[in-house]
């Protein structure tokens, strides 16, 4: 039945001069199809005698809200609104812009306890979900698996289902290493206070591999962040920072090029290093950090070179990926999309 439906849609698409996905949108009364295009598709359907089946692939009109628009939810697991990071705000902006562009109904839901099964998720008639944060508990997982899903960013633990849009972690680490190497640094160090965060580990792996391939030396100054019940976004302890700084100070010869895993960490590491007499700046110890989260950089002098992960672009692209998934529910394989970062060099 699915094969017949797909073949019929393909014939309609060919006659109308559009893509199969456009035919699917017209069938589902999707609001983002141009009126002229929709009319061409309907004429082609009439000419071919094609009547859509309720069993065809793709999102069904019965899943639409009463207004006829697609309803998606942005679900943030393991935290509350008041603990968000600047990068997350960029993510929200991207999601909101894309949802508005496609005339989607967008529902935000923060779920502090990922083991909780919120009534809002149960009651809302959702066409798809965007997910960020901690992995859900068993009951919530079973509910979310029934809905087309896209994860945003590189979560602490890699999700086992759903598509994903995230920064290109290999490119992040490579950019950091190549920048420091280009500045003449031959002994490098990667600072990370969260070794259980798989995306940050990926940054470190790529950074070290790039340095080694260039004949440089890379030291790993890492600590495991203790997890608590305070949520997905947790602050790093000063005790861990000072312990890591002591490790760095004991290295001989000491690395002069440092890559810090994220801006929340560099806001703690750079002042801690300077308090110990480490001179930071051009021709001295130079630092690269990641995320380009301006609020964390206020008060740092000099400002570190930044790697911008394009959080807003990730948000927009996640909505586009969810649209694709809604239109291709029969595709079993997961799609993981990475967004290219770029470097913002320090003026120092």
Identify the role of each PLM range.
Residues 1-63:
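N-terminal helix-turn-helix DNA-binding module of bacterial transcription factors
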Residues 2-4, 64-178, 248-254, 264-267:
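Alpha-helical recognition/docking segments in bacterial nutrient-uptake
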Residues 23, 41, 95, 129, ...:
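Hydrophobic structural packing positions in well-ordered secondary structure
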Residues 40, 86-101, 175, 198-222, ...:
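Short, solvent-exposed amphipathic alpha-helices that sit
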Residues 174-218, 331-348:
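An alpha-beta-alpha
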Residues 246-348:
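Flexible loop/turn connectors
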């Amino acid at each position: 039945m699915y094969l017949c439906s797909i073949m019929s849609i393909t014939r309609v698409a060919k006659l109308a001069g559009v893509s199969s996905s456009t035919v699917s949108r017209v069938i589902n009364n999707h609001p983002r199809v141009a009126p002229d295009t929709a009319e061409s598709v309907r004429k082609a359907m009439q000419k071919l005698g094609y009547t859509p089946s309720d069993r065809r692939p793709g999102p069904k009109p019965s899943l639409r809200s009463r207004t006829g628009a697609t309803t998606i939810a942005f679900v943030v697991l393991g935290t509350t609104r008041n603990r968000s990071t600047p990068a997350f705000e960029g993510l929200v902006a991207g999601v909101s812009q894309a949802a508005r562009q496609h005339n989607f109904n967008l529902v935000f839901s923060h779920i502090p306890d990922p083991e909780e099964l919120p009534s809002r998720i149960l009651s809302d008639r959702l066409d798809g979900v965007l997910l960020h944060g901690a992995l859900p508990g068993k009951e919530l997982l079973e509910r979310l698996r029934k809905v087309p899903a896209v994860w945003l960013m590189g979560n602490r633990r890699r999700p086992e289902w759903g598509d994903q849009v995230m920064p290109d972690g290999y490119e992040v680490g490579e950019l950091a290493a190549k920048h420091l190497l280009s500045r003449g640094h031959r002994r490098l160090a990667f600072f990370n206070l969260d070794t259980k965060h798989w995306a940050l580990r990926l940054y470190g792996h790529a950074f070290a591999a790039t340095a080694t391939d260039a004949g440089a030396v890379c030291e790993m100054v890492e600590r495991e962040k203790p997890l608590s019940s305070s949520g997905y976004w947790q602050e790093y302890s000063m005790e861990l920072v000072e312990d890591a700084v002591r490790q760095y100070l004991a290295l001989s010869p000491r690395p002069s090029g440092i890559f810090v895993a994220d801006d929340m960490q560099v806001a703690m590491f750079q002042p801690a290093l300077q308090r110990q007499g480490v001179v930071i700046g051009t021709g001295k110890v130079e630092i690269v950090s990641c995320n380009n989260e301006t609020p964390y950089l206020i008060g740092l002098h000099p400002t570190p070179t930044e790697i911008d992960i394009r959080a807003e672009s990730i948000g927009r692209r996640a909505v586009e990926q969810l649209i694709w998934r809604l239109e291709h529910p029969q595709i079993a394989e997961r799609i993981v999309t990475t967004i290219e970062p770029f470097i913002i060099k320090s003026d120092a």
